[in-house]
Amino acid sequence: MSMLAAMMVLAGASGSTPAPDVLMRNYMTCAVSTREPQMRLLLDTKADEDYRAAALSVTDVDKCARSDAAVTAPLLAAFGPERGKFRGMVAETLLKRSTTVRKLAALPQVSSYTAGWFAFTGRPQAVDEMAMCVAATNPGGIITLLGTKPGSTWQRQALTALTPSLGACLAKGYQLDTKPAGLRAALAEALYHRDYYVSVPGRGS
């Protein structure tokens, strides 16, 4: 087993998804159903003011909020240290509504990957570059991953199966120390951007 595979197996053995993450995922599902354009803007924007406006627009979805924490959590997550995980949850929720993602073909790997949305994720650029590369070369592997329950044995197995793609796409010399939840989020967002920009003619990353 490679060092990368061993790291992911050990990191994924921590157990079930924490309750706050479950709450946030439920909120995202509800918010997307009522504010899909704003939720997409959170992922697509390349301007700070647009990002803030999009985050503010989903804090007042009253029927989605079951506590004060649920109301404020999206805004805090959109700008805090958990920004990357938050964006990944939004991406996963939007991908569930996609009619095209399963039609994406694996593409040959290219020498570099870059996109305007990297600046808003809060992740190391090398992680987003890797995720974008995997979304291009192995979209099916990410789809399998996103079909698993976060924190489950199935997720761990899906991540292990993705190890060759992750290794091939990771920048030489970069030490990947991202936890499974963060890795899942990065891959989900990268796949969302590939699917959305392929699905909407004239859009670019």
Report the location of each language-model feature.
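Sec-dependent N-terminal signal peptides
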Residues: 1-12
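N-terminal Sec/ER secretory leader and immediately downstream segment
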Residues: 14-98
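Extended amphipathic alpha-helical regions
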Residues: 17, 101, 105, 120, ...
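Short, low-complexity cationic-aromatic patches
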Residues: 20-25, 32, 121-130, 135, ...
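Extracytoplasmic/secreted envelope proteins and their assembly/folding machinery
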Residues: 25-28, 36, 127-131, 139, ...
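Short, tandemly repeated low-complexity microdomains enriched for cysteine and small residues
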Residues: 39-52, 142-156, 202
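A cross-kingdom marker for long, charged
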Residues: 157-205
